[in-house]
Amino acid sequence: ENIKVFNVNSRGKEREGDFRSRQAEKIKVTFNLSENAVAPVAGHKIMIQIVDPAGNVVFDIARGSGSFQVDGREQFFTSVQEILFDNSKQELSFVYDKGSEFDEGDYKINIISDFYEIGQASFSVR
């Protein structure tokens, strides 16, 4: 819940909302994990996928991206964090440095926990 997407420029200034390709050095995604009364306190993998306008997941193994299996199919993730879920509406923050300009168009962000989608957001690059 409370998903926000920021672009971060070369000086570290964060701006929420749509942006121009040359303005973004990095993408920052912040959100809170919802409370889940039936979930035990335990470690979980939280992944994000940044999906480009062509429908491809933005990933770079050298920058911490990777893959996982769902129903026998390989899926890619942009970034991952291992957390201890403690039912306290934890705030998580992911920062992804693409290393090149983002293509113009509409992007989608999928937030995944233990291979299930738990949230979505979007942003546009002009």
Which residues does each PLM region occupy?
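Membrane-proximal structural modules of membrane-associated proteins and complexes
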Residues: 1-126
